[in-house]
Amino acid sequence: MSARMRTSVAVLAAAGALALPATPAAAEGVGTTAVTWSVSLGTAKAEGTRRFEGTSLVAEGRLSNTGPGCYSVWTQVTHDFVPGPAVRNATLCGPGAVDVLVRRDYWLPTMTGRITVCEGSANTATCAPWKSLV
């Protein structure tokens, strides 16, 4: 086989490997064990665990508030260094607690997820620092 042919075969093989989608096994490689997370802002606190189920990133827990005002839990996934939109997952107004359940498709190795608590429910203008879920 000529050097040119070997180079062409190597390039095609590499391109094929890059085109393959991530598999559930890739996500499981990160760890299926539950990992705790916690975010607080003002009188609100969100806490729980995250884990991988196949190709899904799952975060579940509780958003609690001991004071007045509304607070929301938001998540955001970044894929290939491009942040997706922030998604509101739970809102609580006044004292009490509500469940939080987040399930997002997750493809390794170029994806990250993060979570925060924000004042109000309209946007992410006033929030606690984002916490990584991965």
Model-derived regions: residue spans:
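N-terminal prepro-regions of secreted/extracellular proteins
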Residues: M1-K45
